[in-house]
């Protein structure tokens, strides 16, 4: 039984329960967002029950906008809306050069400890990628979020900046580089998982922090250890191939006609213009994150584990770059400590642990008999 057929069988079962009433746009969103079932498969299966399903043309754009709204509410940890009337769109400098760390900007508005600039290199939390930190005129920036098309910088304390004043700003470049490595690696892992597990794989969500990253994938069952090893091997193969990473802006309609709806991989990409990020011959996605210029810049990709987080959705935990090196060092230290405690070298550690477990079972049974 193919993976695609397994997904369709699950869909058939779910639709047989839902078909008694009309499947609304809201239910289509739920099926896609919670179970990884695309509206195209729903429409195909509904025909078998004599039902016609109308899929909105902007379905995937609505999914993206829903994710964007949820993400910003989480990112700002507040439901407040700032009064940004007459404030023009913030010019985002991070698209042109992800490694640019210093820039000058003009103060547009200050609201308590929140600063709006005319242009910025600070990336706001979006697309599952955490915000940048750094300084504005020496004052610490601890959070960055987007309200509509205006980027808001949150300082650690209040500061009186005169509107119109030019200020020198700097982002934490090491943090930015690590986040970029995790973001590009997310696209790489997504492509690797699609190759190993099947073409039904779609990204249902992701998070990129500095220590580790996660990617949620539409898959009908848990991922085995063997499959995880294959995904990691394929991901690192793509890194070693030194593939170019491109980005350009296209009108939404043109992007959809050129690349299809698979460009919507769970990230938040609302708007008429889409930024298309592509890895040569491997992956094409609509994405607004900061990315490397070449897959080789990601360094080693280390997959930590996977977990089934809901029906039809599995999560892969991984690290890349310096974070992967730290993870490897931590694992090495744990192994060395285990060897020290058991008084064996690393080659004999597995058998020593097995013997220890056998001894534990023996004495456990002996203790039960004596009681």
Show which residues each predicted segment covers.
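A glycine- and charged-residue-rich anion-binding loop/surface
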Residues: 1-371
């Amino acid at each position: 039984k193919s993976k695609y057929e397994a997904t369709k069988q699950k869909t058939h079962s779910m639709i047989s329960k839902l078909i008694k009433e009309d499947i609304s746009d809201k239910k289509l969103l739920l099926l896609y967002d919670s179970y990884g079932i695309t509206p195209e498969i729903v429409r195909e299966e509904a025909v078998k029950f004599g039902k016609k399903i109308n899929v909105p043309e902007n379905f995937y754009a609505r999914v993206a906008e829903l994710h964007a709204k949820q993400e910003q509410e989480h990112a700002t940890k507040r439901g407040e809306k700032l009064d940004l009337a007459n404030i023009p769109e913030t010019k985002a400098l991070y698209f042109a050069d992800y490694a640019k760390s210093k820039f000058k900007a003009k103060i547009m508005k200050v609201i308590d400890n929140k600063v709006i600039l005319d242009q910025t290199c600070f990336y706001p939390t979006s697309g599952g990628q955490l915000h940048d930190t750094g300084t504005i005129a020496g004052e610490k920036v601890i959070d960055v979020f987007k309200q509509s098309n205006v980027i808001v910088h949150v300082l650690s304390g209040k500061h009186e900046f005169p509107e119109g004043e030019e200020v020198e700003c700097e982002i934490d470049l090491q943090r930015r580089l690590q986040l970029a490595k995790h973001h590009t690696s997310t696209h790489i892992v997504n492509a690797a998982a699609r190759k190993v597990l099947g073409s039904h794989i779609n990204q249902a969500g992701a998070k990129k922090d500095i220590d580790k990253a996660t990617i949620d994938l539409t898959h009908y069952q848990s991922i085995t250890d063997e499959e995880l090893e294959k995904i990691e091997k394929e991901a690192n193969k793509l890194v070693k191939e030194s593939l170019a990473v491109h980005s350009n802006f296209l009108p939404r309609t043109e992007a959809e006609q050129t690349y299809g709806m698979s460009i919507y991989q769970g990230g938040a990409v609302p708007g008429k213009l889409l930024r298309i990020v592509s890895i040569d011959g491997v992956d094409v996605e609509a994405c607004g994150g900061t990315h490397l210029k070449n897959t080789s810049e990601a360094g080693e990709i280390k997959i930590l584990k996977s977990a089934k987080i809901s029906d039809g959705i599995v999560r892969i935990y991984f690290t890349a770059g310096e974070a992967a090196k730290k993870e490897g060092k931590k694992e090495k230290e744990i192994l060395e400590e285990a060897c020290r405690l058991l008084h064996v070298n690393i080659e004999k550690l597995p058998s020593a642990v097995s013997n220890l477990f056998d001894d534990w079972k023996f004495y456990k049974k002996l203790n039960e008999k004596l009681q």
